[in-house]
Amino acid sequence: MFRDIIIKKYTLGAIRMTQTNATRIEKDTMGEMEVPADAYWGASTQRAVLNFPISNIRYPSDFISMLGRIKRAAANANQQLGLLDPEIAKSISAASTEVIDGHWDNHFVVDLFQTGSGTSTNTNANEVIAKRAREIADGLNIHPNDHVNMAQSSNDVIPSATHLTAAKAIKDELIPALEKAQKTLIEKSNEFWEVIKTGRTHLQDATPIRLGQEFQGYASQIELSIDRIKPHLSALSEIALGGTAVGTGINAHENFARAACEILSKELSLPVKETAHHFQAQGTQDAMVSASGAVRSIAIALQKIANDLRWLSSGPRAGLAELELPTVQPGSSIMPGKVNPVIPESVVQVVCQVLGNDAAISAASQGGYLELNTYWPVSAYNLHQSITLLASATSNFDIQ
């Protein structure tokens, strides 16, 4: 199950569309570009596809969905303020809803390792939504920048989508997984309470301890991990939307961000609000670094639990053999009957990945020069991956 989840979320593979060599001509400010005839993106996105043939890694679908939410909220906010024609807003909203639901994921084609502002992916969203909105509106003139991107810039949209994608994953995936694991550990603590065993410090025998007390310690680790991550929901729900290019809010109505944030807050059940510190929000990744640190601490807590279970189940004849872990698969191709602690081992490997992701986020956060940090895509991907990996690994650890 765990492996399947990772494949769905991260092995995005090639773009699957109708196989055809037909193209059409699209134009942007730099001139004409050939674009696949059945593609919903335009010239600027196609330039980015050609510029960045790096990894075949894309922004995760959760991020693309959040971009759709921001575009829909922006269209509705601009309509409320009398800035966007109601029919255009309605069509953009409908097209954005399809993006939210994942119908156009195969048309988000820009590599993750692109311009550090994420402009190419924001442009990709604007072009896909505009083309689909024109179809919905039966040919009404809807422009990617003038209408879909109204009152926005990549420099505030991408940081906002990055924050909210992480916050939503923490709320909907990580915290529930941790809460279930904590409940299981408390149950095991009660079950094992009467078992007295040798305590160990420095891996050497020490004074007696209840097995239930050891599991009580594990449950407390998870409880405190939840307490540490929850404050980051508020920090990540404070977004840069409304700052536009450099944080001054140029070309955006003064009430635009507030209106859009109210919409997003209701949809996501998060305390979404416009930041009071636009220059900080676009020029730094401070909230990302802090949240990643909390995620890292959760990972290390899980590593402690996983490694303890490996030690306590070691053997079965020449080890500690105080616990027996569920037998889930054969452990060796050469030693019949051998069974290994494969589930805890998978957890520890997830921890290794999370620690690497945290290091990458720390490095990317140092790319905040003057009015913009220019390494948003790699931080967005790594924090989201850390959160979802830990959620999946924790759930699997609990279930197995």
Which residue stretches match the model-derived regions?
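Conserved, well-structured ligand/cofactor-binding cores
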Residues: 2, 13-400
